Amino acid sequence: MGFITKAIPIVLAALSTVNGARILEAGPHAETIPNKYIVVMKKDVSEESFSAHTTWLSQTLNSRLMRRAGSSKPMAGMQNKYSLGGIFRAYSGEFDDAMIKDISSHDDVDFIEPDFVVRATTNGTNLTHQDNVPSWGLARVSTRKPGGTTYYYDPSAGKGVTAYVIDTGIDTKHEDFGGRAKWGKNLVDQMDEDCNGHGTHVAGTVGGTKYGLAKGVSLVAVKVLDCEGSGSNSGVIKGMEWAMMDASGGGNGTAKAAGKAVMNMSLGGPRSEATNQAAKAISDAGIFLAVAAGNENMDAQHSSPASEPSVCTVAASTKDDGKANFSNFGSVVDVYAPGKDIVSLKPGGGTDTLSGTSMASPHVCGLGAYLIGLGKQGGPGLCDTIKQMATDAIQSPGEDTTSKLIYNGSGK
């Protein structure tokens, strides 16, 4: 397991343009969901105009259902509506070809793209320390050279910061979380549990007491992937919207302020303009977002959200500072982090050892929380801080790819 995705080198291509609206298609290897689409509005569309558009949509769908009653199985219509920071407005649902044609001719629509399957991405002077660390990644991020067995960190340890784990859920009762993990939102099923294990492993690296980088951080589970580690692109965007709202105080207000929040997305799929715009809206709201680069050993520009420039895209390194053979690479990668044979938590207690850029990304998310706890500025600029602090360590990082490996600035 690891980066749960089957992202392949796919670039969305415009099929047609009708009155300015683009109808996009995913490449031949994307696992599209029949008749499911994401409709994204133009950036200058107001909330009032968006509401008027969705009213028109409902009325048009109802009118068509009445005309063809009994002739065929009706489409579900709009199922999700999104509004992220007044920047990204969109909706998703089930529509037939005729309805998509009508939607594409609407002046307020920017583009339409098919919904598809997304998967998790698995295959100081006042320092304290943790000796004989259970996972090599902890020692590696706090020392300038490989081979260490001690994790050096400031005792602030990310206290006062909230980390949103957008994944398969978290076993919030696992003893290593020490009561700091809670459920936020479940957008997949009725089971507030991690029946896959991926999300718990990721959360353990972010903020477990023994296995995490930010040992004092608060953790929030946002479940967008099922027991098989898969979900829909539209569902992932809905989870992103909820997390952003909560981090900004619009939901339960767990984080109190966006600048005290970090997010991790160890998941991905083919490049999606809708996903990238949603990720940018999160960054624009002042929230630090770490994402997995992907596990296909290809250029990460073909995967989302990894290809979004405003997020912190993370490739996976090995114990001897090499590029993990599965890790994606390319100019969109911001940093490397440990991602091979990472020990972290599993649901029900105990641990598991997993590899993937899914395991690398939470090292960066945890480091982000740790640095905010030390007083560093949060938001997308935090990725620049992390890059500046990183060591030039990765051997043969890949074509047009950084050799920077994350470092927490311990001085060791």
UniProtKB/Swiss-Prot annotation:
Recorded hits in InterPro entries, A to Z, give: PCSK9_ProteinaseK-like, Peptidase_S8/S53_dom, Peptidase_S8/S53_dom_sf, Peptidase_S8_Asp-AS, Peptidase_S8_His-AS, Peptidase_S8_Ser-AS, Peptidase_S8_subtilisin-like, Peptidase_S8_subtilisin-rel
Annotated glycosylation sites: N252, N264, N325, N408
Active site (record annotation): D167, H198, S358
Signal sequence region: 1-20
Any Gene Ontology CC annotation: extracellular region
- Tell me where on the tree of life, at the top rank, the source sits: Eukaryota
Pfam families in UniProt: Inhibitor_I9, Peptidase_S8
| Name of this protein | Subtilisin-like protease 6
Q: Which organism is this protein's natural source?
A: Trichophyton verrucosum (strain HKI 0517)
